[in-house]
Amino acid sequence: MKNRPLLRSLLFLCCAVYACGKSSNGPSTPVAPTSSISVSANDSLLTYPINMVFTQEVNTTHTTLISGQYADTSSKKGSLSIRLVGDTTGLFKGNSLFVTYTDGKGNVYYKTGDSTNFVQVDKFPKTYNGVVIGSFSFAVSSSAGAIRFSNGSIIAIYQK
């Protein structure tokens, strides 16, 4: 009789441990890291929610493409493409940096020869879904006008 409360306690403890046990519904699905490209463009703030990084061969030159865009379902239009010569961290300026910006009206802008144009890549893991981190500032122009991109930040996902 005296052991009955002890027995109930042990039974309750076993049930609690079993209920709190880890579920074995298979391995958890890894969550893809979030990405963002944000920049001040003249007097506006642009933020691209879909951002990816690719390494590509252009003719015989090894390049890195950093791409920012809106979702196909978004009412916002436009994109930003930054191409760098090489695939490493560091400061990219001059002929090692190419920029194409398309605004919401479809106007296409290209990097100017401004000597202050730069892209700084601080982190570049070359693994699938690795997070590439950097910053940038540059000017682009077209027949529609000129735009200064400043205080830009890159958090983009490496694809290949």
Residue ranges of each PLM-predicted region?
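Bacterial Sec-dependent N-terminal signal peptides
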Residues: 2-5, 17-40
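Intrinsically disordered and other compositionally biased segments
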Residues: 6-7, 48
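Bacterial N-terminal signal peptides
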Residues: 9-17
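Intrinsic disorder/low-complexity segments
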Residues: 17-20, 42, 147, 157
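A short, structural micro-pattern
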Residues: 31-33, 76, 148
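Surface-exposed helix/loop patches within compact recognition domains
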Residues: 37-40, 44-129, 141
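C-terminal or internal capping secondary-structure element at the end of a domain, subdomain, or sheet
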Residues: 124-160
